[in-house]
Amino acid sequence: MSEYSIFTSESVSEGHPDKMADQISDAILDAIIKDDPNARVAVETLVKTGMAVIAGEVRTNTYVDLEDIVRSVILDIGYNSSDVGFDGASCAVLNAIGKQSGDIAMGVDEASEKDLGAGDQGLMFGYATNETDVLMPAPIYYSHRLVERQAYLRKNSILPWLRPDAKSQVTLRYENGKPVAVEAVVLSTQHTPDVKQSDIREAVMEEIIKHVLPEEWLHSNTQYHINPTGQFIIGGPVGDCGLTGRKIIVDTYGGMARHGGGAFSGKDPSKVDRSAAYAGRYVAKNIVASGLAAKCEIQVSYAIGVSEPTSISVNTFGTGKISDDKIATLVREHFDLRPRGLIDMLDLKRPIYRPTASYGHFGRTGDSFSWERTDKADALRAAAGI
């Protein structure tokens, strides 16, 4: 991967229709896994004008009120009246959830707990870089913080004319592999009909952009695009249909690292699309935190029903203190990347998933985000002899 001199990433708010769908899917997963940690869950959501549809496959011994969960998530996000364009209290909720296929269950379950088979084939990537304190790429990190700030101002009525739907985009200039300046910022936010565009631009600039982005990165040639098409009154599921799993680059590294293609939300941890991507982040972050490399990307792959990964690869893009092959050997020695091993390593059978469904799965803080720990860094450093 060559060095970029300019790089752009984007994020979307919790009120974006695709993120609404992700949050509904993960709220359902949380409700089920809270009472049945061994449940198998794969839930997809679609939201469109006046309607939410949930579909997928579930195997569980517990009961949850799916309609109530759907409505609660929509209302919590802020879609609570026809004035906003969508009302969680009155929208239709259609349920098309069925049972998990017996063929899939056989491949995953008919092994010992230690040798739990992967829920599907696939390839997953994890990534970390030392360009931010949380070891995330700066463009996606700051894109998340912009829309997170928009939601804070909206929910606390600091800017009461804000509505739930919003998008951000940050373009950074790099020198010697480090971000040094903001070249462009895009912030589009839904709003009430009665606010002036000039007031929106001023408030977004002062309360969101300047509040979030490092002052020293802003310069006289920075481009600011605030609601560049003009008014943004119609948004959310009225403006666009929302689907689970349609913001996989927003969910991960903003395009800075490769992606295996599998989405996360609505999937229990037996699905390696999710759990192995989390483990990949954990591995890469510990490698960077240990000082073994300034940036690291790990790829891991699986076959359905097989516990051992079919491959583990490491790329430090020329920043490694030791060879990538030696780091890959350390990964195999210090991390159990079998499905059961990584579930136990990261304690993934918990109701921790809805918070991941907005503002990124990585670079977050708090006990729920166990894949963000750097508790293996010292052991890796010692084993590498650096």
From Swiss-Prot:
Q: In which pathway does it act?
A: Amino-acid biosynthesis; S-adenosyl-L-methionine biosynthesis; S-adenosyl-L-methionine from L-methionine: step 1/1
Q: What class of enzyme is it?
A: transferase
Q: Which GO terms describe its cellular component?
A: cytoplasm
CC cofactor: Mg(2+); K(+)
What GO molecular functions are on record for this protein? Answer: ATP binding; magnesium ion binding; methionine adenosyltransferase activity
According to the record, the residues making up region (Flexible loop) are: 100-110
Quaternary structure per UniProt? Homotetramer; dimer of dimers.
> What is the protein's name according to its record?
S-adenosylmethionine synthase
Q: Which organism is it from?
A: Hahella chejuensis (strain KCTC 2396)
Its lineage opens with:
Bacteria, Pseudomonadati, Pseudomonadota, Gammaproteobacteria, Oceanospirillales
